[in-house]
């Protein structure tokens, strides 16, 4: 029945310590940032920063270079969209140091979409006005992220050339 399904689901969520459950029960201090799903980390970052009980822990985690985040279900364009959102037309950033550190963590922990292949390629990125859009998946965000991702992760003569 529907009632049994909801009870089973609730029990399973309790056992795996799902972040939304901890948040709704005001158990903020029990949240472990290196264990939460990547999408949840993206969605709830403002909630973490607003709560005094966890804001300092979140800031410490963001600045700790030895700890990583789960970015297994994020695409590069989603990370770029968050970074671009914090900048104005001239590239001036209104982003906090904590947000910048977390975006860098997500970028560094993106999956290997190139499957470890060492190829000789160069990405040419179109950033003309026709590439703009209002969503995270705007063509410009996709193009920039693809160019950056490939330039950082490929080998060969074009590695790290932007």
Features from the language model and the residues they span:
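Long lumenal/extracellular ectodomains of secretory and single-pass membrane proteins
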Residues: 1-142, 152-162
């Amino acid at each position: 029945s529907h009632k049994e399904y909801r009870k089973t689901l609730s029990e399973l969520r309790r056992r795996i310590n799902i972040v939304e459950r901890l948040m709704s029960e005001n158990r903020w201090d029990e949240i472990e940032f290196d264990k939460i799903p990547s999408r949840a980390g993206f969605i709830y970052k403002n909630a973490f920063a607003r709560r005094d009980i966890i804001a300092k822990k979140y800031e410490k985690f963001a600045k700790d270079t030895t700890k990583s985040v789960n970015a297994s279900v994020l695409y590069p364009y989603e990370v770029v969209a968050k970074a671009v959102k914090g900048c104005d037309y001239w590239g001036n950033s209104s982003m906090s140091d904590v947000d910048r550190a977390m975006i860098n963590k997500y970028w560094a922990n993106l999956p290997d979409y190139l499957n470890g292949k060492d190829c000789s390629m160069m990405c040419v990125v179109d950033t003309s006005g026709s590439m703009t859009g209002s969503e995270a998946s705007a063509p410009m965000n996709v193009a920039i992220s693809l160019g950056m991702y490939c330039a950082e992760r490929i080998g060969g003569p074009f590695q790290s050339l932007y």
